[in-house]
Amino acid sequence: MKTVLLNISSPDGKIFSGEVNGLVVRGVAGDLAVLAGHVPFITNVVPGKCIIELPDGSVKNGTTEGGLITVGKEDVTYLTAGVTFE
């Protein structure tokens, strides 16, 4: 499976940076699943779940405080007040 570079940052610093298979967060219009090769876009993220699938198939589940996500051709940047992973 192709991967995409995911960077999650808050005002306090970097929360996560690395290659992932995918990311699921909740946007203003519903859940967003971002995979490698996704069409570029920018949208707000509302508080709720944050699910990251790592290249080894493991999953990081967390809760996000919301923020802004930018999906580019090569990477995904998520700016948030915070994410708490289980």
Label each region the model flagged.
Residues 5-86:
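Compact, glycine-rich, soluble single-domain proteins
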Residues 1-3:
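Intrinsically disordered, compositionally biased charged tails
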